[in-house]
Amino acid sequence: MTASSNLADLLEQVSVDRMAVTVAALASDPLAGRRVGSTGGAAARDWLVNRFTAPGADVRTEEFPVRAVPQVYEAPTVTWGEGGRTDELVFGRQVAIHPASADTPNIRRGALAVAGKDDPTGRWLVVPADMSLFDAYRDTNRAAGLLVRRPVDAEGWQFTMLAGPDPGPLPVLTLDPDTHHAVLTAATAGDGWLAGATPLRRDDVTGANIHACLRQPAPAGADLLLTAHYDGVGDHPGLRLPGASDNATGVAVVLEAARVLATALPAGAGLSVALLDGEEVGALGSAHHASQLHAAGAAPMVLNVDGVGRLERAAAVEAGGPAHRLLALLDQAGRHTGIPLVAGPVASDNRRYGGAGFAAVGIGAGMGGYHSPADTPDKVDPATLAAIARLVVATAHLAATAPATLSSSIGDKR
């Protein structure tokens, strides 16, 4: 049997249904968005550990500390008005809490003013769109708080971020563009008021990576590491943030690729999986793992998958470390499977591995509803899951067998 026909058989084994089950499970209500250190994150971890069923698989978890994870512990009540009109803002759509906000559980009411122009005392300062939060803080003496503009997705949701600057001394609320414009207009006219709170605490928690060694590498054999983060930003009170595309899809692809490859790679090729925690708070899980690999003298080739919910034109690929050979193999795999690739940012765990000196490539293929309630399983395209899983299988197969060329069913011209 030729390498080409053997790979064709492997690609046929990729199961979309199996991946869809993984996405649905990780995005389900009981897992509550899978924030690092949460009960939902622990439930996701338990579920994932049980997915490794290959004979002889060595599966373990590795804990690491995570400091100051922001968590909205109560839906904020925010109202504003001008003249005789009063509007209560909808949490998650019109208003949200900035990750750099102080924890202010009690409602503060104050007149509106423009940051950097008006007397800040006792007022909510509206930060113009072209002003940074750093600049807005220059003149905030005894201000009630800050109001900053934040874009929304196609369904009108604001996105949630866990990683960001340290908290400042003031409550900071984010407003959707329309509300921000209306509030800024009122403040410029010397009119209007706002009343709101920012119930946002920061918890020190424990994250945990999941490691599975499916095949030990021979001394001169290829050593492949497939990675994806399983944590999400977590639900808010009254708001579900399922994290289907980000990153239940990446986990589903890695699990499926590992299942197909576990018994199919040639003797001497190593295969491991790392399902990583803490990506949403600064890729801390991969930083922890990369330091362990470096200390152990390991040299795996890393394929990281993050956000593969909907392939539009081409899959984004970002390389780090000594990844020239891995990139060449990925390009060859893309040509063979018919998946167009383009160099583009994949701001994920691959950067931690690349920064630690390992050959690392991140793969992304689009998503809907980034860090919002709109990131649901029904928005995940099954064909995209299949395409990226086949790309990973083909790349790993080529890395293990290392043929000079591989005939493509669609030809090598683009």
Spans of features found by a protein language model:
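Extracytoplasmic/secreted proteins, especially bacterial periplasmic and envelope-associated proteins
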Residues: 18-21, 25, 43, 47-50, ...
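Acidic/histidine-rich catalytic neighborhood of metal-dependent amide-processing enzymes
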Residues: 206-209, 232-326
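Noncatalytic luminal/extracellular "stalk/propeptide" segments of secretory-pathway proteins
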Residues: 10, 21, 29-124
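Active-site-adjacent substrate-binding region
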Residues: 165, 310-414
